[in-house]
């Protein structure tokens, strides 16, 4: 089975324009989270869309699904997320297992709730690649020169930009593989390894690159929100 896991566990309101976490802010005439879920509803191979939210916001998320996506709510599961990204993925996979016991071939397409401009092509590419590789990371080629500094004051290295990519989401992998690899980490490693695909990489797994889009914006600042609103208006 193919599942989607939407990471919507953040509670930050650092934009300072609302007391709502950013995934619940309005974009156009609907919350950002709803825009994101809608993209996954369009892919018929996805059995369930599991949304991991902070426990304080579970009821609110359920109300939004009832209001904006009543025809699709049977495909959507709202569950309590974890304290960080990887524990939220773990909680999402546990919710999938509760819905239907996991098989070794079950795949989850994980995605940031605040990337509402994901395309159907990106979702389908992730699913296709995950069937032949251990994991998939969605990326775009680095446009700006990236510099490295180990002390925050002086440049220690300028890597070759031709070899660099900017990570986005989705990140896709088999549910059981993630659970096994995450379970094998020490507590210290879990603190350091906040990116799911990095866990696969350090464990020597095959992580394929899926082509992202520069329009696959992650809305984390007021400027991001302004850009997203202009993109919605153009559509």
Curated annotation (Swiss-Prot):
PROSITE patterns: ISPD. The lineage of its organism: Bacteria, Bacillati, Bacillota, Bacilli, Lactobacillales. The record marks 161, 218 as: Positions ribitol 5-phosphate for the nucleophilic attack. It comes from Streptococcus pneumoniae (strain ATCC 700669 / Spain 23F-1). PANTHER family: 2-C-METHYL-D-ERYTHRITOL 4-PHOSPHATE CYTIDYLYLTRANSFERASE, CHLOROPLASTIC, RIBITOL-5-PHOSPHATE CYTIDYLYLTRANSFERASE. The gene is tarI. This is Ribitol-5-phosphate cytidylyltransferase. Keywords: Cell wall biogenesis/degradation, Nucleotidyltransferase, Teichoic acid biosynthesis, Transferase. Pathway: Cell wall biogenesis; poly(ribitol phosphate) teichoic acid biosynthesis. It catalyses: D-ribitol 5-phosphate + CTP + H(+) = CDP-L-ribitol + diphosphate. Its EC number is 2.7.7.40.
């Amino acid at each position: 089975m193919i599942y989607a896991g939407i990471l919507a566990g953040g509670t930050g309101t650092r934009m300072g324009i609302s007391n709502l976490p950013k995934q619940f802010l309005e974009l156009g005439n609907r919350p950002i989270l709803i825009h994101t879920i809608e993209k996954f509803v369009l892919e018929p191979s996805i059995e369930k869309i599991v949304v991991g939210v902070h426990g304080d916001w579970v009821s609110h998320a359920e109300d939004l699904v009832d209001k904006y996506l009543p025809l699709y709510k049977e495909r959507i599961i709202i569950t309590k997320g974890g304290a960080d990204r990887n524990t939220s993925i773990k909680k999402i996979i546990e919710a999938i297992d509760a819905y239907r016991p996991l098989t070794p071939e079950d795949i989850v397409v994980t995605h940031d709730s605040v990337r509402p401009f994901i395309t159907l092509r990106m979702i389908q590419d992730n699913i296709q690649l995950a069937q032949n590789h251990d994991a998939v990371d969605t990326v775009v080629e680095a446009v700006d020169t990236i510099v490295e500094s180990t002390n925050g004051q002086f440049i220690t290295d300028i890597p070759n930009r031709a070899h660099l990519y900017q990570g986005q989401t989705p990140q896709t992998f088999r549910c059981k593989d993630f659970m096994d690899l995450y379970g094998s980490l020490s507590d210290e490693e879990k603190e350091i390894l906040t990116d799911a695909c990095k866990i696969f990489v350090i464990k020597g797994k095959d992580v394929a690159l899926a082509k992202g889009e520069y329009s696959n914006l992650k809305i984390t600042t007021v400027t991001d929100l302004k850009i997203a609103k202009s993109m919605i208006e153009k559509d």
